[in-house]
Amino acid sequence: MTKDIMDAVFIKEMAKTTSNLYRLGWDERNGGNITYLLDEKEVAEYLDVKQIIRTIPMDFDGKKLAGKYFLVTGSGKYFKNVEEAPAVNLGVIQVSEDGKAVHLLWGYTDGGLPTSELPAHFMSHIARLSVDPENRVVMHCHATHLLAMTFTHELTERAFTRTLWQMCTECLVVFPEGVGIIPWLVPGTNEIGEATSEKMKENRLIVWPHHGIYGAGQSMDETFGLIETAEKAAEVYTIVMSQGGIKQAITDEQLKALGERFGVEAKAGYLNN
C-alpha cells in the first residue's frame, strides 16, 4: 500500500518554495517554473509507477532523460495556489523511453500540462547532469532586481558577475563560476532551451535579459539560495546606484583572499591580476 503523496517531502518542498517565490514577488501571475528530478524509489513510496494517467507529447528529444521522474509546476499555474492545491498545480511525470513524450503519474487534475518551459528545463537538466550527477533542481523566476539590472548594466558575463561579486561578500563563495547570460529569445522555445543549456555546462545561474533568471542545484534549498544570493546583490547594486553610485567596493585582492579562505576559485580571467 502506497503512502499519501501529500506527505511526501518533495511535494512539501515544492509547495513551500513556490509560496516563497510568490511572496517575494519573483513569480507574479503564472510566471516562473520549477522541475525537480526524483528517484524512482521515492516516487514508488507514493505512486504506482506503472499507472499512467495520460501521455503528453513533447516537441523535444528527451531521450537522455528517458525513464526519469520529475515533479513539475504546471503550465499557466499560479505559484500562489500551489500550497493549497498541489494536485491541480503540480504533476509527477516520467519521460518516455523514446524521449518524445512524458507520462503523467499524478497531478494536473484539471487537465493541465507541464510548464511551457519544459524543453529549457529538460535541456538544462541534461547539461547539469553531465557535469554534476547530483543536480536535481532547475528553477526559473523573475527576480526583480536582477531583471532590472539587465536594462541598466553592461550585459557581458564578466562585467555582470564582477558587479554581483562586489556587492555582497558571500557572492563569490556561492557562485565562483559567475553567471551566464544569453541573448533575449522567445520563451517556451527549443531555441531558448538550447542557449540556456549550453551555458548550464559551466554556470548554475543563467540570466535571461529583460525576462528573469534560471538557477540549478542539487537541492531545492541550494537552488533557491543561489538565486536569492544573486538577487540580494542586485538589490544592493540598485540601492547603491540610487544613492549616487559606487564610491568603494570589495577589491580584487580581497576577492582573491575570500576565495582562498573558503576554498573556491573565481572564474579564470574575471579578477584583475
UniProtKB/Swiss-Prot annotation:
Family, as annotated: Belongs to the aldolase class II family. RhaD subfamily.
PANTHER family (UniProt xref): 3-OXO-TETRONATE 4-PHOSPHATE DECARBOXYLASE-RELATED (PTHR22789:SF0), FUCULOSE PHOSPHATE ALDOLASE (PTHR22789)
Cofactor(s) required, per the database record: Zn(2+)
Keyword Transferase: no
Protein name from the UniProt record: Rhamnulose-1-phosphate aldolase
Function: Catalyzes the reversible cleavage of L-rhamnulose-1-phosphate to dihydroxyacetone phosphate (DHAP) and L-lactaldehyde.
GO biological process, one term: pentose catabolic process
Entries under NCBIfam families matching the protein: PRK03634.1, rhamnu_1P_ald
Protein's cellular compartments: Cytoplasm
Biological pathway: Carbohydrate degradation; L-rhamnose degradation; glycerone phosphate from L-rhamnose: step 3/3
Keywords: Cytoplasm, Lyase, Metal-binding, Rhamnose metabolism, Zinc
Annotated coiled-coil segments of the chain: none
Cofactor note: Binds 1 zinc ion per subunit.
Enzyme Commission numbers on file: 4.1.2.19
Origin species: Listeria monocytogenes serovar 1/2a (strain ATCC BAA-679 / EGD-e)
Binding residues for Zn(2+): 140, 142, 211
Origin: domain of life: Bacteria
Pfam families attached to this UniProt entry: Aldolase_II
GO terms under cellular component: cytosol
Catalyzed reactions: L-rhamnulose 1-phosphate = (S)-lactaldehyde + dihydroxyacetone phosphate
HAMAP family in the cross-refs: RhaD (MF_00770)
Gene Ontology MF, one: aldehyde-lyase activity
